Amino acid sequence: MHKSAGIIVKDGALLVLRSKGKDTFYAPGGKLDSAETPEQALCRELLEEVGIQVTLNDLTLFGRFEAPAHDKVDVTLIMDVFFVNAYAGEVVASNEIEECQWVDSSNVDNISISTIFRNNVFPQLVKQGLVN
């Protein structure tokens, strides 16, 4: 399974979302549609999930990560993660999103967050001084 995700940081905190009926928070993004690049998928998902417009030039690759897919047996998730350097609009949860949160080191342990972001992405953002 191939997904892309976006790193959006504001005031030293990372944006994470929780879908309706789910317990785990994740960074905005989602599965690639057929013939879509990871960058195109992320631009589409950001508009669908939080109503912001992003161009391909606004994205910088942060890294590619692999982990067992959440709630799927014998499925590996490949996730391309991008910095979202700029966007147009305001972050507003769509009807498929139950909750948006801005997390940093002071509150990240209070929520369930996706494995790749908890184990790989978030610690690197803290180490690089991008997230408090």
Identify the function of each model-found stretch.
Residues 16, 81-83, 102:
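Conserved hydrophobic/aromatic beta-strand scaffold that supports enzyme active sites
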Residues 1-27:
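N-terminal strand-loop-strand
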Residues 92-124:
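NUDIX/MutT-family hydrolases
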Residues 28-62:
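The catalytic Nudix box helix
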Residues 2, 65-90:
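Active-site-adjacent beta-strand/loop module that shapes the phosphate/pyrophosphate-binding cleft
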